[in-house]
């Protein structure tokens, strides 16, 4: 399944979740798009709820189905809770860490920065958004890319960095100090439904 590239606000309203992380999509119209949007949301079956939760998480991180399932299967081989491990693996993607550090305003912007070679991991350029960042690794910006408006503007407005990351705004450099705990990740997601979906 290809990555969704349509209007993110419309998709956010359909899923009932802010994919941009700002919440603006749902402020004025907290209902699904279309002529029947303002009415009650259709009651979903058990399968429908599981599918919707999977779609929420997949679109939140902006990954295609193949990448999503690959990480899900990888999480199954780890010790601990399957669903929590899956969430942690998604959060450790390089594009997501770039976003969480405040170097981009959205995950989509962060993915573009990585794709275009603007991001360094431990001083070396990495242009693979799905790269798994490990605890202790440092994420930075190439010298030639430090004046990009997309980066400067994002850093200026960002006022929150998760506790499992550190960030130096002057150096445009951050460290993935540890793996996040489940309580630090997407409280609006019920990952147990996603595990149930793939266990059918």
From Swiss-Prot:
Domain of life: Bacteria
Residues annotated as domain S4 RNA-binding: 92-155
GO CC list: small ribosomal subunit
Alphabetically ordered keywords of this record: Ribonucleoprotein, Ribosomal protein, RNA-binding, rRNA-binding
Pfam families: Ribosomal_S4 (PF00163), S4 (PF01479)
GO molecular function, one term: rRNA binding
PROSITE patterns: RIBOSOMAL_S4, S4
GO biological process annotation, one example: translation
InterPro entries membership: Ribosomal_uS4, Ribosomal_uS4_bac-type, Ribosomal_uS4_CS, Ribosomal_uS4_N, S4_RNA-bd, S4_RNA-bd_sf
The keyword Ribonucleoprotein is assigned to this record: yes
Family, similarity comment: Belongs to the universal ribosomal protein uS4 family.
Self-association and partners: Part of the 30S ribosomal subunit. Contacts protein S5. The interaction surface between S4 and S5 is involved in control of translational fidelity.
Role, per record: One of the primary rRNA binding proteins, it binds directly to 16S rRNA where it nucleates assembly of the body of the 30S subunit.
Protein name: Small ribosomal subunit protein uS4
Origin species: Bacillus velezensis (strain DSM 23117 / BGSC 10A6 / LMG 26770 / FZB42)
Gene: rpsD
């Amino acid at each position: 399944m290809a990555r969704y590239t349509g209007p993110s606000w419309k998709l956010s309203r359909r899923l009932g979740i802010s994919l941009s992380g700002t919440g603006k999509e749902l402020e004025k119209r907290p209902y699904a798009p279309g002529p029947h949007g303002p009415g009650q949301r259709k009651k979903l079956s058990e399968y429908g709820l599981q599918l919707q939760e999977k779609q929420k998480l997949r679109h939140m991180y902006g990954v295609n189905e193949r990448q999503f399932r690959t990480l899900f299967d990888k999480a199954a081989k780890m010790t601990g809770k399957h669903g929590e491990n899956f969430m942690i693996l998604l959060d450790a993607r390089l594009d997501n860490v770039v976003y969480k550090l405040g170097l981009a305003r959205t995950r989509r912007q962060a993915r573009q920065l990585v794709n275009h070679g603007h991001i360094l991991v431990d001083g070396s350029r990495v242009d693979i958004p799905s790269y798994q960042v490990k605890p202790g690794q440092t994420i930075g910006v190439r010298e030639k890319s430090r004046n990009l408006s997309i980066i400067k503007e994002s850093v200026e407005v960002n006022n929150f960095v998760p506790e499992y990351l550190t960030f130096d705004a002057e150096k445009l450099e951050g460290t993935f100090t540890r793996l996040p705990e489940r309580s630090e990740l997407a409280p609006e997601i019920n990952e147990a439904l996603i595990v149930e979906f793939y266990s059918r």
